[in-house]
């Protein structure tokens, strides 16, 4: 059960003390307090952990400071979409809103190469009105002999250039606790010119200790990709690890499943789960068409597979697109064959916008018929 307190509740007040004293007297019930501090208000939630079936919602709602009460199911307790759940399905970071009603495009380099490539990519994004990007500094690879990223050496110039070209958020994968500290230090040294969304890749979806560590910090939001060899339920519970440790600013990423049933694409496209994840949880849903398709193959109509798939999923309500571009794919250190060209960026963005408008029209249509 979750007690949602009135906004800006003073935790030093007598009424709050009265509430906590009452909760402390509940046998077999433990409490966990979570606070979200926004620009205009502070929101406090108290999680009651244990056998709460005997607790009456009306009685709990009548307690001091309590504005609403949510009875949660066993699964996805924090991030789940429960009955009569008024909690928001969005969050803001660095002035960018991430929610189940928004769409953000994160185009960029799968792996950071030289500084010129980074600058060319970021300049193109700025010139096309974008404020988010992807930049891979740490690259987990299947082969121990493959390039594994420039690591902390590239962070200063990536962050400096991101600030120069107005990037508000960079999606960046980490694979170890030390990477989190390196990102913090590099941001501090460069004057924090941009923000970072930490990315947990498919290989680390069940690295539970890493999930706990990332979940305990709340300065960076998290993009968690679905594990490529596990069920959707297992991946959603991985996201719950993050949230249960305190970080609720989580985006769930679909990137295709590893199976030969996806041939000739790199992975089997699992984007039909976009509406499923939105129905089960309050997380925004990201799709990664580049790592699903893995090639620049085109249909007879001339449209690239990666663009067809992106459009299909945006029309189904996806909230974030993580896509590979590169100024010179032949020189890319990772995944060059699947990267789109910088000159294709305006075309890609316009195609995404067409798909988004189609989705909004579909929602409008549903609402109109629901009223009739």
What is the predicted function of each stretch?
Residues 1-106:
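Non-catalytic terminal accessory/regulatory regions of metabolic enzymes
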Residues 140-195, 207-209:
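N-terminal active-site wall of soluble small-molecule enzyme domains
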Residues 93, 206-325:
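Catalytic alpha/beta core domains of metabolic enzymes, predominantly
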Residues 134-153, 325-336:
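Glycine-rich, proline-tolerant flexible connector loops at the mouths of alpha/beta enzymes
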Residues 103-120, 143-149, 169-174, 199-202, ...:
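Active-site mouth loops of central-metabolism enzymes
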Residues 91-110, 141, 282-295:
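N-terminal small/glycine-rich loop or linker at the start of catalytic domains
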Residues 147-172, 214-221, 271-287, 338-359:
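Alpha-helix-loop-beta-strand connector modules within alpha/beta enzyme cores
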Residues 103-109, 131-135, 169-172, 196-200, ...:
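Hydrophobic faces of well-ordered beta-strands that scaffold small-molecule active sites
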């Amino acid at each position: 059960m979750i007690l949602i307190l009135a906004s800006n509740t003073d935790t030093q007040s007598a009424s709050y003390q009265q509430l906590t004293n009452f909760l402390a007297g509940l046998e077999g019930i433990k409490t966990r307090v979570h606070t979200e501090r926004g620009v205009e208000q502070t929101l406090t939630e108290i999680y009651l952990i244990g056998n709460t079936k005997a607790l009456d919602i009306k009685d709990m709602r009548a307690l001091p400071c309590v504005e609403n009460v949510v009875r949660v199911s066993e699964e996805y307790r924090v991030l789940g979409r429960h009955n009569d759940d008024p909690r928001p399905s969005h969050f803001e970071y660095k002035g960018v809103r991430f929610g189940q009603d928004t769409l953000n495009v994160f185009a960029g380099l799968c792996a950071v190469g030289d500084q010129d490539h980074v600058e060319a990519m970021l300049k193109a994004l700025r010139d096309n009105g974008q404020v988010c990007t992807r930049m891979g500094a740490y690259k987990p690879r299947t082969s121990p002999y493959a390039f594994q990223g420039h690591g902390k050496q590239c962070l200063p110039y990536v962050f400096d250039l991101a600030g120069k070209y107005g990037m508000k958020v960079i999606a960046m994968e980490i694979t170890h606790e030390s990477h989190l500290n390196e990102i913090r230090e590099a941001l501090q040294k460069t004057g924090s010119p941009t923000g970072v969304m930490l990315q947990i890749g498919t290989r680390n979806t069940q690295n539970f200790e890493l999930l706990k560590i990332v979940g305990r910090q709340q300065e960076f939001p998290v993009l968690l990709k679905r594990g490529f060899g596990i069920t959707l339920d297992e991946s959603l519970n991985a996201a719950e690890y993050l949230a249960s440790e305190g970080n609720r600013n989580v985006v769930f990423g679909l990137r295709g499943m590893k199976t030969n049933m996806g041939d000739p694409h790199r992975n089997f496209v699992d984007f039909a789960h976009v509406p499923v994840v939105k129905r089960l949880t309050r997380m925004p849903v990201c799709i990664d068409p580049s790592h699903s398709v893995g090639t620049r193959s085109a249909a007879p109509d001339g449209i690239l597979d990666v663009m067809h798939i992106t459009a299909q999923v945006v029309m189904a309500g996806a909230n974030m697109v993580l896509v590979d571009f590169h100024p010179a794919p032949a020189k890319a250190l990772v995944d060059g064959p699947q990267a789109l060209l910088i000159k294709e960026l305006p075309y890609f963005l316009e195609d995404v916008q067409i798909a988004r408008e189609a989705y909004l029209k579909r929602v409008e249509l549903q609402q109109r018929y629901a009223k009739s």
